[in-house]
Amino acid sequence: MTTAFYPGSFDPITNGHVDVLVQALNVAEKVIVAIGIHPGKAPLFSFEERAELIRLSLAEVLPGKTGDIDVVAFDNLVVDAARSHGATLLIRGLRDGTDLDYEMQMAGMNRTMAPDIQTIFLPAGTASRPITATLVRQIAAMGGDVSAFVPAAVLQALTSKRPD
């Protein structure tokens, strides 16, 4: 069984992340969605909230495939975390050339540290290309409509986080 590791902050999960996950399930039988925990960062959503939003979002889009996806936390090197979960593929989504330049550098470093783990780049769909979780948080915090950028469960969670 091929296992893929899809790391990110997912704060929150966006339609772009979901798009990449759907594609990832076409190249791997199992996908580990790995939420990075960084002590120096103050995320909008806790790990538990992000994990639940990922599960709810995927249940909307992939009702029959949720058993093929695990959600975990990690706070170490991506390749070490991937290896500890038995993953041989590292999934990275690409929106544009800027992402590609950065991700190619990371893929090279990861390949040197873990030659047994292959990085797979999956392009974001046209509709999800401009979406970033940072922009979603900023727009939502200012009362903007982010419904085109996030799954319904995330929209509801963002609305509940907004001060009245």
Swiss-Prot record:
<feature type="binding site">
    <location>
        <begin position="9"/>
        <end position="10"/>
    </location>
    <ligand>
        <name>ATP</name>
    </ligand>
</feature>
<dbReference type="Pfam" id="PF01467">
    <property type="entry name" value="CTP_transf_like"/>
</dbReference>
<dbReference type="GO" id="GO:0005524">
    <property type="term" value="F:ATP binding"/>
</dbReference>
<dbReference type="InterPro" id="IPR014729">
    <property type="entry name" value="Rossmann-like_a/b/a_fold"/>
</dbReference>
<feature type="binding site">
    <location>
        <position position="17"/>
    </location>
    <ligand>
        <name>ATP</name>
    </ligand>
</feature>
<dbReference type="GO" id="GO:0005737">
    <property type="term" value="C:cytoplasm"/>
</dbReference>
<dbReference type="GO" id="GO:0004595">
    <property type="term" value="F:pantetheine-phosphate adenylyltransferase activity"/>
</dbReference>
<feature type="binding site">
    <location>
        <begin position="128"/>
        <end position="134"/>
    </location>
    <ligand>
        <name>ATP</name>
    </ligand>
</feature>
<keyword id="KW-0963">Cytoplasm</keyword>
<dbReference type="InterPro" id="IPR001980">
    <property type="entry name" value="PPAT"/>
</dbReference>
<comment type="function">
    <text>Reversibly transfers an adenylyl group from ATP to 4'-phosphopantetheine, yielding dephospho-CoA (dPCoA) and pyrophosphate.</text>
</comment>
<keyword id="KW-0808">Transferase</keyword>
<feature type="binding site">
    <location>
        <position position="9"/>
    </location>
    <ligand>
        <name>substrate</name>
    </ligand>
</feature>
<comment type="subunit">
    <text>Homohexamer.</text>
</comment>
<feature type="binding site">
    <location>
        <position position="103"/>
    </location>
    <ligand>
        <name>ATP</name>
    </ligand>
</feature>
<feature type="site" description="Transition state stabilizer">
    <location>
        <position position="17"/>
    </location>
</feature>
<keyword id="KW-0547">Nucleotide-binding</keyword>
<keyword id="KW-0460">Magnesium</keyword>
<feature type="binding site">
    <location>
        <position position="41"/>
    </location>
    <ligand>
        <name>substrate</name>
    </ligand>
</feature>
<feature type="binding site">
    <location>
        <position position="78"/>
    </location>
    <ligand>
        <name>substrate</name>
    </ligand>
</feature>
<feature type="binding site">
    <location>
        <position position="92"/>
    </location>
    <ligand>
        <name>substrate</name>
    </ligand>
</feature>
<keyword id="KW-0067">ATP-binding</keyword>
<feature type="binding site">
    <location>
        <begin position="93"/>
        <end position="95"/>
    </location>
    <ligand>
        <name>ATP</name>
    </ligand>
</feature>
<keyword id="KW-0173">Coenzyme A biosynthesis</keyword>
<comment type="similarity">
    <text>Belongs to the bacterial CoaD family.</text>
</comment>
<protein>
    <recommendedName>
        <fullName>Phosphopantetheine adenylyltransferase</fullName>
        <ecNumber>2.7.7.3</ecNumber>
    </recommendedName>
</protein>
<keyword id="KW-0548">Nucleotidyltransferase</keyword>
<comment type="pathway">
    <text>Cofactor biosynthesis; coenzyme A biosynthesis; CoA from (R)-pantothenate: step 4/5.</text>
</comment>
<dbReference type="GO" id="GO:0015937">
    <property type="term" value="P:coenzyme A biosynthetic process"/>
</dbReference>
<dbReference type="InterPro" id="IPR004821">
    <property type="entry name" value="Cyt_trans-like"/>
</dbReference>
